[in-house]
């Protein structure tokens, strides 16, 4: 009886277990508590380096490797070297994202994290198939700066229902695959970013190694935003991050080194996208392919129009 009353007394007066439980509930409901702000994580140099390296090699380098390696090594009816890069990306990236979430000083909702990872893998896998076929069509004269129906190798196909099939393939590649790939990707990064705050302004600094990674990281995200045609998703994520920074600043909480690195990378990306759009603003051919209000040409469309056509 005495032991029971002692446990009840501890629970009522806020013993260690109760305090931990309260802290956990606060974290689950999205607010950065004082305890969480005090648990500032060191800069994850290893994860950010691996993350940036595999993005450049396995994602950006994927179509380049497909064009560089001899066609005899990877026949058109077999997976290309770029496809194997994509397969590796689909395995390594979710693993790195999970490791990043594990190192967050804030307790993040596991169910949302796991569902996001599952959808990410599904979307990236859908994109793997569609992108593989679309890039293999380059060897047959397919031009990325034209729409599917305007491409010389497709517009005269018989029966015409075959054109519908290629448009469906393009839809899975450029729309459904990208949405299921990038929405959970940016959601996970934002959830991680929401825990990157510290109560100490002295810890709100970017270390030297992080500064060296900002440029390649921001440049990769520029490629991701332009080639993936996800400017709206990116700008929404960036302004959500900015709003969170301003909101936490009122509570005297500041971005830690990891948060500053991610925010700086996104800010550089926004600048590069603006310069890219300004440079190609008056291109009549690309304007025809991207007629909407949001005009963000794809790098590969620029390549097939202005680079490969000269050779």
Curated annotation (Swiss-Prot):
Presence of keyword NAD: no
GO-annotated biological processes: cholesterol metabolic process; ganglioside metabolic process; glycosaminoglycan metabolic process; locomotion involved in locomotory behavior; lysosomal lumen acidification; lysosome organization; positive regulation of proteolysis; protein catabolic process
A cellular component term, taken from the record's GO annotations: membrane
Effect of residue 17 to S: In CLN6; uncertain significance
InterPro entries (UniProt xref): CLN6 (IPR029255)
Gene Ontology molecular functions: lysophosphatidic acid binding; protein homodimerization activity; sulfatide binding
Compartments in which it is found: Endoplasmic reticulum membrane; Endoplasmic reticulum
UniProt keyword list: Disease variant, Endoplasmic reticulum, Membrane, Neurodegeneration, Neuronal ceroid lipofuscinosis, Transmembrane, Transmembrane helix
Membrane topology: Multi-pass membrane protein
Segments passing through the bilayer: 56-76, 81-101, 111-131, 179-199, 204-224, 225-245, 260-280
PANTHER family with a match to the protein in the record: CEROID-LIPOFUSCINOSIS NEURONAL PROTEIN 6 (PTHR16244:SF2)
Subunit structure: Interacts with CRMP2. Interacts with CLN5. Interacts with CLN3.
Disease: Ceroid lipofuscinosis, neuronal, 6: An autosomal recessive form of neuronal ceroid lipofuscinosis. Neuronal ceroid lipofuscinoses are progressive neurodegenerative, lysosomal storage diseases characterized by intracellular accumulation of autofluorescent liposomal material, and clinically by seizures, dementia, visual loss, and/or cerebral atrophy. The lipopigment patterns observed most often in neuronal ceroid lipofuscinosis type 6 comprise mixed combinations of granular, curvilinear, and fingerprint profiles. Ceroid lipofuscinosis, neuronal, 4A (Kufs type), autosomal recessive: An adult-onset neuronal ceroid lipofuscinosis. Neuronal ceroid lipofuscinoses are progressive neurodegenerative, lysosomal storage diseases characterized by intracellular accumulation of autofluorescent liposomal material, and clinically by seizures, dementia, visual loss, and/or cerebral atrophy. CLN4A has no visual involvement and is characterized by progressive myoclonic epilepsy.
Name listed for the protein in its UniProt record: Ceroid-lipofuscinosis neuronal protein 6
